[in-house]
Regions:
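Pro/Thr/Ser/Gly-rich low-complexity, intrinsically disordered linker/stalk tracts
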Residues: 440-467, 513-518
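Beta-strand-rich modules
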Residues: 499-517
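Solvent-exposed loop/turn segments flanking beta-strands in beta-repeat/beta-sandwich domains
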Residues: 463-485
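Noncatalytic carbohydrate-binding groove/subsite architecture in carbohydrate-active enzymes
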Residues: 143-275, 285
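Substrate-binding cleft and catalytic face of glycoside hydrolase catalytic domains
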Residues: 45-207
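Aromatic/acidic polysaccharide-binding cleft in carbohydrate-active enzymes
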Residues: 241-355, 360-364
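C-terminal beta-strand-rich structural cap/linker in extracellular carbohydrate-active enzymes
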Residues: 411-443, 507
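Carbohydrate-binding surface patches
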Residues: 349-399, 431-435, 461
Length: 518
């Protein structure tokens, strides 16, 4: 079947703050071994270079040791890629003015330490609680005056210190509780809230549902439009698909199943379509930034713990650190829907083609199309106010043939599509996602030098190129072997690799840059 689509760059458009993740691993990352961090967690993060990150932090009782560990993590991750950091804290119930004043001072002390002592200048946003929780989950949704009180004490303390951190309200979940934003507006919280936000998990719609996109986009549009008169933006602080414990799988053998249902019911590959159209709906509605829950799994329960929390783009299941299928779908959006880009306006009469796009200040642009048809679609795309002197790279996520990598490397582009005037023709397979982009540079990274192998450990000199992201390590039977996917043995951000295979061989190392060139 065939279809038509128009992609337009508007003369005036608000900035997009980027896609990313809730990085829950930030508080436990020192439990990781070098293989997990260097070859998976750090490697994938630098390859995707997210523009936005939400994390637990800014607790009033945070210790120096905990903050130092957190800061070291951020230096290796968010600071490397320039991601905006949004911290969400937690606290206990305080009653007196003295207690609340001390609470606000303690939070400000810790944020100052991170920003000024540890150099985390990208800590920009703070909220006092997760999902309006204090004594119990979400209880402040019914005590909004209490939320405002805590928020006000924080605002006054931050203002007194000229602390460059925005306060966010209300962080409510699910989207039916975004009405708390309306309460905040009506009750004087706009002057003390620089940004607003909320969460949502798709518990009422199966991955195959074709109406959720429309419904979610409308909810996002409603809250975005509600805030426009006050010049405030809305952030999707957490989003995800159905929670297993709300789908009749509350626990298994006493273990609470706080997991993404799609990862356990056989729909992991197909559900990537829904998570991506959820992200595109938010972009098209004018949401400023968003964080998928989560980047890495929470470690398996131990001791008296009983909750299994498995939502990560990357697994943390004992020693299984590999990528889930969503990496090759949502990961593409994270990489190419960059921070400080501007959303494009896309129109199509085909209800089952869900699309979104952004344009960067250098004129490069990216467009993602989710095909919900059960057959391929030939699309003629008309470009308005967009020009390209180079072909568009086409990246494909086919839910029936996921381009998985043993090393959690993003897939290569599979086609170069010429732009004939202002027209582009592309085929999107059934139940698939295509991303088209001119956001790249044809560049051959400099050769890696100083490669030395001894006793199964390979070392090399670090790349000095600014656009370097990670290394690929290859092993062959002769000194003149050609590096291929078949003889790749690792991807890493380190400058060394210990080969678990003791068999002798020859090694080569390549640099992979920001555009996937190697």
């Amino acid at each position: 079947m065939s279809s038509k689509m128009t992609v337009k760059k508007e003369a005036i458009m608000a900035r997009f703050g980027g896609m990313g993740f809730h990085n829950s691993e930030a508080n436990v990352w020192r439990e990781m071994d070098d293989v997990q961090f260097n070859q998976y967690v750090g490697k994938v993060y630098r390859e995707l270079s997210p523009g936005f990150s939400r994390m637990w932090g800014g607790f009033p009782e945070w210790t120096k040791e905990e903050m130092d560990a957190f800061a070291e993590y951020c230096e290796k991750m968010q600071c490397k890629v320039g991601a905006t950091i949004y911290l969400t804290g937690h606290c206990v119930r305080y009653e007196t003015d003295e207690e609340l004043t001390a609470y606000a001072s303690n939070v400000a002390d810790r944020l100052e330490y991170l920003i000024y002592e540890k150099g985390l200048s990208n800590v920009k946003i703070y909220c006092m609680s997760n999902e309006l929780s204090l004594d119990d989950w979400g209880d402040l949704a019914f005590e909004m005056a209490t939320f405002k009180k805590y928020h006000t004490y924080l605002y006054n303390e931050f203002a007194h210190r000229h602390l460059p951190v925005y306060l966010l309200a209300t962080d409510a979940s699910p989207m039916e509780r975004w009405e708390t934003v309306e309460w905040a507006i009506a009750n004087g919280m706009v002057p003390i809230s620089n940004v607003f936000g909320g969460h949502h998990y798709v518990n009422d719609f199966e991955a195959e549902d074709l109406d959720f996109y429309k419904i979610f986009k409308r909810h996002c549009s409603d809250v975005v439009n509600m805030l426009k008169p006050y010049e405030r933006r809305f952030i999707l602080g957490e989003f995800g698909l159905a929670q297993a414990f709300k789908q009749g799988q509350n626990n298994i053998n006493g273990v609470k199943m706080d997991v993404c249902d799609a990862f356990y019911n056989g729909k992991e590959s197909y559900s990537a379509l829904q998570i991506c159209e959820m992200a595109l709906a938010a972009v098209n509605a004018g949401v400023y930034a968003m964080a998928l829950w989560t980047f890495v799994d929470v470690p398996n329960p131990r001791d008296l713990q009983y909750r299994l929390n498995k939502w990560g783009l990357l697994r943390w299941d004992d020693t299984d650190y590999g990528a889930r299928d969503w990496l090759y779908a949502y990961g593409l959006l994270v990489r190419y829907f960059r921070k400080n880009s501007k959303p494009l306006t896309i129109s199509s009469e085909d209800y089952l083609l869900r699309s979104g796009g952004v344009v960067n200040d250098d004129g490069s642009f990216s467009v993602a199309i989710v095909n919900r048809h059960k057959e391929p679609v030939e699309i003629d795309i008309s470009l308005e106010n967009l020009k390209s002197d180079k072909a568009l790279r086409r990246y494909l996520y086919d839910s029936a043939n996921v381009p998985r990598s043993k090393f959690a490397d993003l897939q290569d582009y599979d086609e170069l599509i010429a732009c004939a005037g202002n027209s582009v023709h592309v085929t999107v397979p059934a139940s698939a996602i295509v991303l088209l982009t001119t956001d790249y540079t044809d560049h051959k990274p400099a050769a890696i030098t100083g490669i030395c192998a001894e006793d199964g450990t390979v070392t090399w000199e670090a790349s000095t190129e600014a656009e370097h992201r990670y290394y690929r390590v290859y092993k062959g039977d002769s000194a003149d072997f050609v590096p291929t996917k078949e003889n790749q043995v690792a991807s890493t951000i380190a400058t060394s690799f210990t080969d678990p295979d003791a068999a002798p061989g020859f090694y080569k190392v390549e640099s992979v840059d920001a555009w996937g060139n190697h």
